[in-house]
Amino acid sequence: MKKFVSFFCLLSLVGCSADDLPKYSDLGGLRVLALVSDNGGFAEYSPGDTVQITPWISDFKGGTRTIESSWQACIDPGITVGADPTCTGVPGATAVTTGAVALPVTERTGSVGTFSVSIPSTILDGRNPIEVYNGVNYLVTYSLKASDGATTASFKRLQVTPSTKTGKNRNPTLNDLLAGGTSLTTFPSGEVELRASNAPGSAESYTRMKNDGAMENRTEGLVTTWFITTGELTLFRTIEDGITKWTPGSRPTDHTPLVLGVTRDGRGGISAVMKSGL
């Protein structure tokens, strides 16, 4: 049985070095860290489902500026074959919904207001058997704009398969962030090994239909992305139960340190845990 590690990590392995970390794992400016979708724990949906989207964002060094969000949804225009991740001009796209973002109190980082997306009941109509079995993507775009003009954007693809399908993908469960094998609860005095503690069964096995109609067995590969407000990491992404070493340095006096982990299963499933008040 083949194991498929999330493509975004494979493509970035050349960048998983300390030289790149300040550009990615260090929290500072306005960022969308994850868009977690959920419907009863599932990360794979059926036509007509209403899906809850919970953004995880950070504006750690944003001061007192205010943030406005906007989102839109549409059938995926073909991102995997080069289309831009946008709903602009896509037939059947929803209207753009905007609103003020209530930023988390803790260092302006964490989960913010959930919004609901309704998947069209006709999304699978006219699709060929391979598309129906493997799933059709429903695209959700999400953007943020700060009162001083700073902007950022992200997107989420919701995998949609028939309601009769069994064994649909579920979100992984990131139970805890470990430091030296125990729960990270205090600011370390020196270098520690960080590890994501995912619940058993979070990496699921599934089948996918190939272009010739044959079935292929696969197993998800869990990838955890790490974010920090101080110190340095040796890796900003770890695979499965791999470790990254965190050298926190002296405890900062200008903010309360935090560490955030986001686990992805490569099929749209996401789980996030933040350790604050360290």
Residue ranges and their predicted role:
Residues S12-G15:
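C-terminal motif of bacterial Sec signal peptides marking the signal peptidase cleavage site
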Residues S25-Y45:
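Post-signal peptide N-terminal segment of mature Sec-exported envelope proteins
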Residues G41-T50, L184-E191:
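Short, solvent-exposed loop/linker segments at the N-terminal edge
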Residues G63-S70, T219-F227:
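Solvent-exposed loop segments of extracellular immunoglobulin-like
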Residues S70-R127, T230-T247:
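Surface-exposed, flexible coil segments in extracellular/virion-facing regions
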